Amino acid sequence: MTALLIDGNALSKTLRAQAAERAAALTARGHQPGLAVILVGANPASEVYVRNKIKACEDNGFFSLKDAYPDTLSEADLLARIDELNRDPKIHGILVQLPLPKHIDSHKVIEAIAPEKDVDGFHIANAGALMTGKPLFRPCTPYGVMKMFEAHDIPLQGANAVVIGRSNIVGKPMAMMLLDAGATVTICHSKTRDLAAHTRQADIVVAAVGKRNILTADMVKPGATVIDVGMNRDDAGKLCGDVDFAGVKEVASHITPVPGGVGPMTITMLLINTIEAAERAADAAA
């Protein structure tokens, strides 16, 4: 059996077309959705991510603003800029590209973003709202994964799901969303004693640790759905995920590729979150 590929590019195209329609409707009402992206320093990967986010905005009728600063920017100046954007009615979403330079406290920066403009869903108010089943914004990567399950009719209710990784950005919110959908969820991480014992029982495995080949074919239950959130480089410098794709695709029923899987969905859900923020702001102003 060869797994069915869950194509993130194709699903993104459909969802972005829907986002563009909603953006056009809002713009016609005088409320073009606006996203501000802040980049501090010259991290090459961060520069690529920011460029892709700005391009996605431009391609789908969003207003976008990119603030790029040297890594010498002070924390106080960054917080002051966020305060300005919080009060700017043209901006509905604010995203600070992580990681930040060491002298800037990323937790403090995230908490400075107004919760109603926190389209990454990282603010403590939004994390708490997700935890209690009343999310304002869902973090973009796990939200994109949930859309993939939905598009491919992958049953979650009663399913055994293993999430490998416990970050605030992917692992923890992913587990909460699966739990809300009725799955029985196990979170595994670097201190987990026998990872394979957990993954072999799983109907769904989400790998999100940033470690190549953490999941191999012998660790996967036949017919499982495998979602690869990892972004790594192989020995030849080629982009790859956390999953041994060649081996696992012969065992799983569904699998996401890297690249072209979860990556494009993350930016798509950023657009969806920004649209939702803009729609709420427009309704409040009406």
Swiss-Prot record:
This is Bifunctional protein FolD. Its EC number is 1.5.1.5, 3.5.4.9. It comes from Burkholderia lata (strain ATCC 17760 / DSM 23089 / LMG 22485 / NCIMB 9086 / R18194 / 383). NADP(+) binds at G165, R166, S167, S190. SUPFAM superfamilies: Aminoacid dehydrogenase-like, N-terminal domain, NAD(P)-binding Rossmann-fold domains. NCBIfam families: PRK10792.1, PRK14186.1, PRK14189.1. Keywords: Amino-acid biosynthesis, Histidine biosynthesis, Hydrolase, Methionine biosynthesis, Multifunctional enzyme, NADP, One-carbon metabolism, Oxidoreductase, Purine biosynthesis. Catalyzes the oxidation of 5,10-methylenetetrahydrofolate to 5,10-methenyltetrahydrofolate and then the hydrolysis of 5,10-methenyltetrahydrofolate to 10-formyltetrahydrofolate. The keyword NADP applies. Homodimer. GO terms for cellular component: cytosol. Disulfide bonds: none annotated. PANTHER family: C-1-TETRAHYDROFOLATE SYNTHASE, CYTOPLASMIC (PTHR48099:SF5), C-1-TETRAHYDROFOLATE SYNTHASE, CYTOPLASMIC-RELATED (PTHR48099). Belongs to the tetrahydrofolate dehydrogenase/cyclohydrolase family. Pathway: One-carbon metabolism; tetrahydrofolate interconversion.
